[in-house]
Amino acid sequence: MRHEQICVSKNEGNVVMTGLFNEVKKHADTDPAEFWAAAAQDVSWIKPATIILDDAKPPFYRWFVGGEINGCYNAVDCHVEAGHGDRTAIIYDSAIIGVKEYISYAELQDWVARCADVLLQNGITYGDRVIIYMPMIPQALVAMLACARIGAVHSVVFGGFAAAELAKRIDDATPKMIITASCGLEPGRVVAYKPLIDDAIELSAHKIDNVLLYQREMCKAAMIDSRDMGLG
């Protein structure tokens, strides 16, 4: 059963939806390899898998052996290539600052490509770790997608974490770069992120050479010339 074949009218109610869910779940439980092989046809592969499920050494299972895929392409580029570049990809709605923005797939593709280029220019490559320490703004999604685009591994750390907690995560992940914003917003206050970043790097055993920072108008951060760079 292909997933796009499951279409339920709002008028059909929860009973029909529950029945379809149970049918899909039964398929997945009965023949997981066939189920996920069908699901895999709904995304674009750079190189298709030669084996869907390798269960030769349980409990260590391997899925989509030999396959190669780019999550960023499937999330962004494929929609632009299909002629949907003008459609909305992200709706940013901030009650705190009273802003609502609509970002198209074409705009998102441009932002992500430019961010990915900055990562590559600063030596971030396939398999490298990047910590993303940002508020819930579109630039956080851009950073995640840019990492996925080049095969870097991103670790999202809650923006506003204390320096000591961030330092622990720096030592755990040993990232080559931190992507951050100058501040985050909470009801009634602005939380400056850059001092927390600076203190965390000072506390951590693992040192980071690159900090990519998005300056927000409500709190501009001081930059360290030898380490910090702006995210446009």
Give the role of each language-model region.
Residues A28, V76-V80, L108, V112, ...:
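Adenylate-forming
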Residues A33, A113-D117, D171:
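Solvent-exposed alpha-helix faces
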Residues C72, I90-L145, A162, L166, ...:
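Conserved AMP-binding/adenylate-forming core of the ANL superfamily
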Residues E81-G83, L119-N122, K168-K176:
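Glycine-rich phosphate/diphosphate-binding loops that line cofactor/substrate pockets in enzymes
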